[in-house]
């Protein structure tokens, strides 16, 4: 299985500043020109919400302050400017190889 290592495990960011979350895959998640890395946001008591698919594509209805980048094994989620409603846990997920796997999560606190 592909192991996804997220960092940091938690971070606290001031309102209006930038939050950066990294995800490193144990092997490439690229295939045929695309990177099959996705990012989700989860708030307590709610199902995960898809933010970014294939590394850099913004899901419909998601604010443009969320952006994703990377390829191969190294990926980044940026949130800028951070808003209070962004307090949540964020997960990377690869969909290149079965079984699809998730990172262990990054908890974002807004200061």
Curated annotation (Swiss-Prot):
Residues 61-92 are annotated as: Framework-3. Residues 54-60 are annotated as: Complementarity-determining-2. InterPro entries: Ig-like_dom, Ig-like_dom_sf, Ig-like_fold, Ig_sub, Ig_V-set, IgV_Light_Chain. Residues 24-38 are annotated as: Complementarity-determining-1. Residues 1-23 are annotated as: Framework-1. Residues 102-111 are annotated as: Framework-4. PANTHER family: IMMUNOGLOBULIN LIGHT CHAIN (PTHR23267). This is Ig kappa chain V-III region PC 6308.
